[in-house]
Amino acid sequence: MYIDTEVMIAENMLPYINSEGLHIYDRNHGFSQFVFTGVEEDIIKAVNSYHDLHEVWSQVSTKYGVGDSKKAKISFFKYVEKLYDNHIIDYGGIDRVIMGKPDRIYPLFCSIELTNVCNFTCSHCYKEAGPSCEEYISLESIRKIADNLKNHLYSIDLTGGEATIHPEFTEIVKMLDGPKLHLLTNGSRLADLDNEILKRFEIIQVSLYGKSVEEYLKFAQNIGFKKVCDGIKRVTDMKIPLVIAINLREDIIDDIESYIEICRSLGVKSVRFGIPLKSGRNDGVITDWDISPDKMKEFVDKNRILREKYNDIDIQEFNKADIRRKKRITKNRATIVCGAGKTDICVSEKGLVRPCVMLPENYFGGITIEEYISKVEMNTGIDYTDVICETISKLRDRGKTIDSFCESAFA
């Protein structure tokens, strides 16, 4: 790179700081995270302040007392080159806002389960949501999030149950305006929402459970397939970014191209795939949502072929890490190794905070939103060690391991 040109933290990077140091997230690659040593952190902060590499070197070399050491200077510019090669820095002179606070651990991403009520009764639902459920998050809990956390959040996901069923959904959306808002929905009520509310969402994600009324009746106990399609078409016609999420079954893999064709006919520009959690209604039993290793390999091949065939729709590459069989956690202790519980939190309809939507509330949801906010303000954090140990013990009695919730969260 040219050392006499202005440099800045790259536009696609999201810088965030907390009491544990500087973190940078790559928004173009699934928010993959970069962490840094103290010296590296000081270099990046200086880049963000001065934008001139000679001045950055001057500031860092003075702080660490290396003077004009030739060896140190060579190491400095090699590291700057590495930052550039990894697209962490780029040419430019813009100061980037660094989110968070250096003396706190504020969350950066928050999922809010507005309700456990749903007009579908999906056979794989991790929350066991359905029409017979009756809990809704209170406006008081939403107000606490808005007053104490909202200004520190990069994004908020509204989910459920079916989030749009909440009787105060419109007011909640308005209260949480500020961070990037994402709606995760079954799509059946999108056609009925006000344009003003829909336009407040940066992204709307619709889960697609089948390609016909019959399949919706079988897997979601609802005949609302046409209603879902109408909602999707309305959103794409409004030019609101929309992604279709397809949880895989073996019958879906057999006919995956038909799903892509349906999405294209509705104006969808992005499709992603996932595997349902083995919890809730999908816990502990062999179901239609279980996929053999051979079938999964078949899907990975089909996914590649479809991405090559269709250039008018972003068919997201399936993350092979999702299907890789990792070494199982069999010890009595484990730790959370991702951002869950720190940069990521989930708030349930009960107003309880847990580290992530993928970690069930009956194991991890033991702290109220009020208690959580208090711990953030006092920078005491939440120690999940005992919870994890208890969960490992309970799951072992059922012949399961803790990484059955998420294969990448624990070590």
Label each residue range with its predicted role.
Residues 1-48:
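Acidic, low-complexity/disordered tracts enriched in E/D and polar residues
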Residues 5, 333-335, 350-411:
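Flexible mid-to-C-terminal extensions adjoining Fe-S/redox cofactors in radical SAM and related proteins
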